[in-house]
Amino acid sequence: MDFSNTYRNYGEVVDFPEDFLSDYVPTVKSEPEPAAIAPSVCEPPISTTRNYGTDFGRASSMCGSSSSSSSSSYSSGSSPNYLTENGGDTEEPRFEELVSRKMSFDSENVAQVSNQMDYARDTYADSRIPFASIDSNDALLPYPVNNYVAALPVPVPAKKSRGRTAPRTPKSLETSKPGRGVKRPASKEIDAKDLGIGDLSAHMNRQIGDDEELDTQLIAHRILDELKEQCIPQASLAVKVLGRSQGTLSDLLRKPKPWGIMKNGRGTFQRMANWLDLDPVVRRALCFMKKEDVARITGMAEPTPAKRARQTTPSDERIRRFTFTQTQLDSLHTVFQQQDRPNREMQQALSATLKLNRSTVGNFFMNARRRLPKAAPVSQNLVAEHAIDHNQPGPSHHY
């Protein structure tokens, strides 16, 4: 019996061996069909479609529809029995019997078919093609065997969870998380001796001629692109290479003024242009060296701190508070009652008489005025008292 029939299942051809089901399907001699029998006998055609349920149902319906009509014809004896061999006693098994025999084959064949189905399932899973589009209630998958539809048991696929799960991506194809694609430079500073960078002071300190100008807009754009591509912190370039603060460099790069009207930033832009002319490896290395090494290599003088306007003196050299003698204090109070704002000549005369500095005399009168309550000036009070003593009216103010 020839079992070389094949069945196409979702693009894959399943070949049946010659000895497949040889123990269960008997060999039947093929004879010409009698002319009296209509072509609606229980012999379904070979299915080549993918709709398993339709083919199996079609075969069952054909068997069911022909069973009633054939039984009446067989009983009447008007036509020979098609399922008998030469009109003898041996009948060919019906389609239902073939199905029942096939369903009762031993565990070895079940394991063989299960292995074939597992292989097919793995193949379809790799190509991301669904294994079978049949309902979970269907447990039979028809296969054409010698012009008969033999139903083979098929493992029912497990029901998937309701939640959608994204297909797993191999680790080799996984992309890095956002923000981790670019390797950040190490924060540890490197040594100039390891890189072998020589003296760059002549290159970094060169100046252009008086009749030449630099394109500040272009230099600013190139600096920003270089910092972004090489992952260089702006503060490192500003402090170590340019000798400026990070805020000053940010202002120069954000709003670069034309070279003609620029006054204070020309040296910084000249140094930036010299830095851009260096090799890319050297440019990046200068920004991650120690500040002292960069200053030594590039010949940049370290910035000196601004001198404080008033330096603190040691505690033993502090200026002590001046104390007046009682005679000096009485003389100054007497003059203050008569004139709270003495002129320069009067202050000099007092300082010479009392043996004091003129600044000390001036400070005394200023402090005395601050201690007075907010009232009429001392000179007006003295005039008013003098008028009362002599029974004369005081000064009147006419507005």
From Swiss-Prot:
UniProt entry tagged with the keyword rRNA-binding: no
Matching InterPro entries: CUT_dom, CUT_Homeobox, HD, Homeodomain-like_sf, Lambda_DNA-bd_dom_sf
Gene Ontology terms for molecular function: DNA-binding transcription factor activity, RNA polymerase II-specific; RNA polymerase II cis-regulatory region sequence-specific DNA binding
Stretches for region Disordered: 32-91, 158-187
Gene null: resulting phenotype: RNAi-mediated knockdown results in viable hermaphrodites as in wild-type.
Expression across tissues: Expressed in hermaphrodite gonads.
Classification via PROSITE patterns: CUT, HOMEOBOX_2
Superkingdom of origin organism: Eukaryota
Compositionally biased residues, Low complexity: 60-79
Gene Ontology cellular component terms for the protein in this record: condensed nuclear chromosome; germ cell nucleus; nucleus
Ranges in a coiled coil: none
Family as reported in the entry's similarity comment: Belongs to the CUT homeobox family.
Role this protein plays: Transcriptional regulator which is involved in the sex determination and X chromosome dosage compensation pathways. Directly binds to 5'-ATTGAT-3' sites in the promoter of sex-determining factor xol-1 to negatively regulate its expression and promote hermaphrodite development. Associates with condensed DNA during mitosis.
Protein name per UniProt: Homeobox protein ceh-39
Organism annotation: Caenorhabditis elegans
Upper classification of the organism: Eukaryota, Metazoa, Ecdysozoa, Nematoda, Chromadorea
The gene coding this protein: ceh-39
